[in-house]
């Protein structure tokens, strides 16, 4: 879910936005100064939008300082001209700046008029802010979304599945999970998590009682998350992952099921595996919207890059072609056959 700050446009910027609707301006630079959205610069239309693009946008960008760029295109919509919103957030900017700009983008769109903004571009390098970078973005955006490994499996399964006639005599075999009850402390900890008191919870299953208990509730930094995963026992983990992606700020609940290989007993592995789905249903009933479910062997897997890739898979525009496998090494020389001469 995306969150907003209380930052609003100042009076000067509001006036600029009003004048922009008549097509006078080609570009408007917006910065956050003194907890307000402020007008950093404007430039009027000179030629067509493509020839103006690099000449007008490039000089407005500072290497280490984020900003928003509103760029007027030449295409018309019922309200007037369509606009491109560029969120310039360089990698060298501070984390606080990245968070503030990501959280304020929705407010900027509302202040300017969301209906006028027909395209958006999130840029972290100066190259992405060029006309060529914009064209690459358009090409990438038009590509189909990548499939997860699970979706790929389902796609292949549908190609080969056999359609069977179903009638009243058809029998179905199902295997449901084990619904382990939650302790009172566990329910209270989840409710505190939803209220914002914690951002990390760890749960264990009491194998004798067959009940789920909370074993840790705390505010944990992402860098310390791997240390929370035990090396000798299975656990469930619930983490509120605060991050930015393409200029937007997200707070996403990530559920992690950690199972450290075969160091656990067979019963422990079976209990954690069987209780997982019903436990997730219980979390949903308590108001926790789990965005991603993960299974890991070791806490070292829980890095920011790993979580970003899991929540926001990167598009793969071209699949690599696999080389033809080599034949057996001792295949022998080729055998030639000569046609028999006919008398």
Curated annotation (Swiss-Prot):
Any one GO molecular-function label of the UniProt entry: actin monomer binding
Domain ADF-H: 11-135, 184-312
A biological process from GO: positive regulation of neuron projection development
Chain intervals for the UniProt region annotation (Disordered): 319-343
SS bonds (residue pairs): none
Pfam families, sorted: Cofilin_ADF
Family matches, as InterPro entries: ADF-H, ADF-H/Gelsolin-like_dom_sf, Twinfilin
PROSITE patterns assigned: ADF_H (PS51263)
GO CC annotation: actin filament; cell cortex; cytoplasm; myofibril; plasma membrane; presynapse
Broad class of the protein's primary localization: cytoplasm
Alphabetic keyword roster: Actin-binding, Cytoplasm, Cytoskeleton, Repeat
Subcellular location: Cytoplasm, Cytoskeleton; Cytoplasm, Cell cortex
KW RNA-binding (keyword) present: no
Family note: Belongs to the actin-binding proteins ADF family. Twinfilin subfamily.
Function according to Swiss-Prot or TrEMBL: Actin-binding protein involved in motile and morphological processes. Inhibits actin polymerization, likely by sequestering G-actin.
Assembly notes: Interacts with G-actin; ADP-actin form.
Protein name per Swiss-Prot or TrEMBL: Twinfilin
Species this protein is from: Drosophila melanogaster
Phylogenetic lineage: Eukaryota, Metazoa, Ecdysozoa, Arthropoda, Hexapoda
